[in-house]
């Protein structure tokens, strides 16, 4: 199964719901979305729509270490997950979070804890990590590691979660050759389940073009 969506709602939610059946909610990274907003999303979302939640930034700021701050942040996240019937959580490392043996162990312990609360747990290791360095630990914890298939190659696992950050950062868009290349890569893969999340400024248009190239 191939899922395509965006990081947040780049257009009004009612319009987004007409185009996609998946979104990675970004508001949960900064805090708890308003109760009215959450209820409206759930009410307006079509049948079969899936919400993933971006984990609280406090988790990364605390270095993924267990403690009261992380415990409180996770409790808030779980509350939103219950309202949206979300079973996927994505945790992003801060850009200055270094790759080290100690941090790999800490992240593994955190992912194991998160996996007891969410069916699918995803870790985006950030720019200082090679995804291959954390994948063994994440796999042991039952979690997925984010890759950019255009720059970091595809995942070798049957279930994969890709985030597309833009060819030159958040403010860039994918030109047609890049979309075509991404579609070629996607068509060649044999994942049982795979999710493609566009996170760049033109994510809505780029995700639609990718879906068209995939004939989805």
Question: Locations of the language-model features?
Answer:
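Residues lining hydrophobic/aromatic ligand-binding pockets adjacent to catalytic sites
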Residues: 1-216
